[in-house]
Amino acid sequence: MTTTLRLATLDDVDELRALMTLSIRRLIGAYFDADRVEASYEIMGLDTQLIEDGTYFTVLSGERIVGCGGWSRRATMFGGDHSGGRSSRLLDPATEAARVRAMYTHPDFARRGIGTRVLAACEAAAAAEGFTVLELVATVAGEPLYAANGFTLVERIDVPTARGIAIPCARMRRGVSVNAVRGANPGG
């Protein structure tokens, strides 16, 4: 399968949201009952600030977006435009971890390396801005991908929703690889 990685644009928003909805329904739905899947939409989805910041990637098969994800230099850990608890505060790369955010793959393209490809792009971009640590909040569906890519569990958290249904997640982190730092700083 040949794919192309590129930065997302605001023109991609509708297609990204449709992909996220499908991914949540089918991939998260393999772990949760229907009520918990519906509640998940409150804490997941597209944060267009990532697109505006130039830190959100898409993976295309032909002209079709089959995966997406990004990283952030801002304090928000997870959630879409509609989610509460967001913060636009800029992180200090010397003392804080860059955030890996909003990773989604079309269910028909799952487990084909798309998530790993997006993670590598996020890592290289964050390293280029001086970040040495990556952190994220993983869903139960995403946790195996992150573990396979060197992220370790910091803590298990239950994220509350307005429906009164908690969504089990895992806060995970890892250092930026030496190769990403070298790629971000040629000669370094």
Label the predicted regions:
Residues T132, V137-E143, N149, E155-G188:
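C-terminal "cap" of GNAT-fold acetyltransferases
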Residues F109, G113-A121:
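Conserved acetyl-CoA pyrophosphate-binding loop and the N-cap/start of the following alpha-helix
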Residues T21-L46:
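Conserved GNAT-fold acetyl-CoA-binding loop/helix
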Residues D47-D53:
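Short loop/turn motifs at secondary-structure junctions and domain boundaries
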Residues D53, L60, V66-A110, A125, ...:
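Conserved acyl-donor/pantetheine-binding loop and adjacent beta-alpha core of acyl/acetyltransferases
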Residues L60-G62, R174-G175:
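Active-site beta-strand termini and strand-to-loop segments that position acidic
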Residues M1-D14, S177-G188:
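Conserved N-terminal entry element of GNAT/NAT acetyltransferase domains
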